[in-house]
């Protein structure tokens, strides 16, 4: 009887552990992906960098992207 209970509980415990681990390991956003709605989801070597969009001096929106930490981007003319 104990063997039947044990063999029933072991697969259940393994499946529960796998599901819990999958929830904790959410997929991170790779470089250059939009992170406006999820700023904490960039991969570990990236940071969610946000930029304001302006038209004729008036702010019209905001864009956020997963970019490399410590890298400065400059506009080219």
Curated annotation (Swiss-Prot):
Q: What domain of life does the UniProt record list for this protein's source?
A: Eukaryota
Tissue specificity note = Expressed by the venom gland.
Under the heading InterPro entries, the entry gives:
Spider_toxin_CSTX_knottin
Q: Which residues form the propeptide?
A: 21-26
| Entry PTM | Contains 4 disulfide bonds.
Mention any one GO cellular component term assigned to this protein in its UniProt record: extracellular region
Question: Where does this polypeptide localize?
Answer: Secreted
- Keyword annotations: Disulfide bond, Secreted, Signal, Toxin
Signal peptide limits: 1-20
Q: What is this protein called?
A: U8-lycotoxin-Ls1t
């Amino acid at each position: 009887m104990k063997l039947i209970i044990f063999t029933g509980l072991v697969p259940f415990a393994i499946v529960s552990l796998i599901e819990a681990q999958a929830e904790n390991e959410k997929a991170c956003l790779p470089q250059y992906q939009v992170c406006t709605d999820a700023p904490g989801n960039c991969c570990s070597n990236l940071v969610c960098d946000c930029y304001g969009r302006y038209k004729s001096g008036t702010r019209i929106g905001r864009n956020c992207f997963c970019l490399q930490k410590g890298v400065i981007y400059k506009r080219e003319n």
